[in-house]
Amino acid sequence: MLGKVLRDRLIRAITRPPFRDELGRKGRFERIARAGPHLIRRLRLVIDGWPRWSHPLRVIFLSDFHTGSHSDDVARLEGIVAEARAFTPDLVLLGGDFVNMQLFGAGRVPPKVIAAVLARLDARYGQFAVLGNHDYLYGAREIADALRAHAITVLDDESRSVKVKNHSIDLVGIPNARVVSARSKQLLAGLVPESTVGSGRPWNLYRPIAAT
């Protein structure tokens, strides 16, 4: 029993150093921990039965930031958010993995810093997020609290309906698609395909059912 306690403490010490690196600089490892370029994909989706508006609904989906994995990660996140803002989104969906472990350098990037950057994304219909597996490993409560403090809705086996003119889009957040809870099954069973965006982790198990 004592061995398990010591092992668990060691694992926590390795994977959960303090949230104290405000910039994500990685300390002495800065030069060898650069992130690769991020990927932007544009899709135009048409839904049968929906009107063809003069201003199509613009949805931005951002995911897998892993902030803290690379040097200057906060500046990298700021750049991604600036690019997303240029698309003038109507709705923002955040797919989780906001943080990652920081074995080297000054410590992990505080969730409040990440949430403050993401809050710069203005969207008339709001921002909605699910947590990823890294978020659960390295501080789900802290991350969810930080996002909510910046008016970002976190969907944890929950759904929300967004009114768009005379139509509605149902957002369903399934945080961990590997372990589908009774609540998850209930939410998925009640989906209306014409109006639902389903999102879960990992993403290859769920696809957007409808979006435009």
Segments from the language model and where they lie:
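Residues at the starts of beta-strands that form the adenosine-phosphate
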Residues: R58, D90-L91, G126, S168, ...
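A short alpha-helix capping/helix-coil boundary motif
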Residues: R58-F61, L121-R124, V192
